[in-house]
Amino acid sequence: KGNIDGPRIYSVGDPIFVTKYRTKMYRPITSLKDALEHVQFNKDHGATAVKDYSNHNRAARQHLVEASRQLGINIISESFSNPQMNLTQLVDGFTGLEHTMGLEPIYEDVIQLLNSTALGITPTLIVVYNGPSGETYFHQRERLWEDSKLLNFFRKDELIRLRRPTHYWPDDHYTAQMGITMKKLYDRGV
């Protein structure tokens, strides 16, 4: 519902990485027992949801969904711009999708499928899949190292180091298109 104060880490706890590219956060799931252990760990630490990162193994995802159901906790997806995976997560019972599916336009069949579930979408348009992220807009149009509000939190040299000088033409910015698509979903009750 958007009423959680503070960083997401306090609502989802440690993410569940089932791929080995984050070796220190790797949490393999080969059974419902494994999934129950990981979900219970997060719940014991106060999480109200678990976040499944880029889990390409559908059986493992289904174990996480079942464990989440059994333990009364939400399960949120980080899908790395894989619309097909998003659709299987939707069908399998995920309760949340962060970012977007990286897909636009979204046609009526997918809108109806989304609308028939209890899935919530947090678009996070600063990170947009399959196009330049929303962050690039600010790096291109603003001199962030001169922003007085940002300078309250960061030193000027840090802001200069973080800038990413790139150029995108206005019609290259995918964030606005994705925002329009997300608004259509919102208007339809998704």
Regions found by a protein language model. Name each.
Residues 1-5, 27-48:
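Alpha-helical scaffold segments that flank or form the walls of functional sites
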Residues 42, 64, 68, 88-90, ...:
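Generic structural signal for hydrophobic
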Residues 38-56, 102-190:
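Active-site neighborhoods of metal-dependent hydrolases
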Residues 2-15, 61-80, 118-123:
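Alpha-helix-loop-beta-strand connector modules within alpha/beta enzyme cores
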Residues 46, 69-73, 90-97, 116-120, ...:
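Glycine-enriched alpha-helix->loop->beta-strand junction motifs that scaffold or abut catalytic
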Residues 7-24, 62, 152-163:
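N-terminal small/glycine-rich loop or linker at the start of catalytic domains
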Residues 1, 17-18, 55-60, 80-87, ...:
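Active-site environment of divalent metal-dependent phosphoester hydrolases
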